[in-house]
Amino acid sequence: MIERIAVDPNVHFGKPFIAGTRITVQSVLELLDEGLSFDEIIKDYYPDLAIPDIQACIQYAIALVAAEEIHLTAVPA
């Protein structure tokens, strides 16, 4: 399903987007963060999307975070 996500340096400055569209993964994730349902995103914002496109955005974000090495630094009190 993650194959639905594309990255092209000539589209949105290389930010990941849903293949066949110009809709960024970030845009979809922000709508989810606002509490919108998959159906609301499709009906009210992106009628060309399908539920698997939104699921692919979530899977892409999970894969990105899982692959990243995180280093925490202590913050002085």
Residue ranges: model-predicted function:
Residues T24-A77:
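Long, charge-rich, low-complexity alpha-helical segments
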Residues M1-F13, P76:
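Basic, low-complexity segments
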